[in-house]
Amino acid sequence: MKELLFATGNKSKAKRFTKGLLEHDIKVLTLEDVPINIEVEENGTTAIENALIKARAYAKETNLPVFAMDDTLYLENVPEDKQPGMYVRRVNGKRLTDEEMIEYYSNLAKEYGTNGLITGRWIYGMALISNGHEYTYTWSKENFYITSTPSKIINPWYPLNTISINIKLNKYFTEITEEDKLLIQEDESHVVDFLVNSITDSKAKKKNNF
């Protein structure tokens, strides 16, 4: 079985692609599985740039193919200077705690939303490095609401879920059940296809000395 390193320490994030890649005989490893301890300065201006920075840094430390991803958040009707972009947790140079994030974004919804609701969209950037070749991919997920009224439940790692509402179900993400997830699960097989096809392409190029 082939191994592919995901440049993240977040196991829950890795689960998004684990099953699909296993079907292609590829096992996903995270930074918890490999003896690499480096600091990476993510100073790119886009999600793709940051993903490339992370992938390049870890590719130098291992012989494994490496992929990394980053995301940006766009909020409708919010001024450009207040758009979170890549810095969802960092506001005015300060890294926010979970509680501060909930307060800050719920206040944005109150100020710029309609009836306390702002429409948001996550846009993702991914980079893979294999056999010295670089590949990039971007996609977005379905719109959702950020509300000025928080749920009473806070998710570790994902504090924005406390003030985020799935439009299809009209439920807070923190209150969505396993049954609900089956109804709203977005097909990310195209991301798995990108990873598999990129690895396959890099092997072909290596074989042909490209």
Task: Give names to the regions the model predicted.
Residues 2-5, 12-19, 23-210:
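Anionic-ligand binding patches
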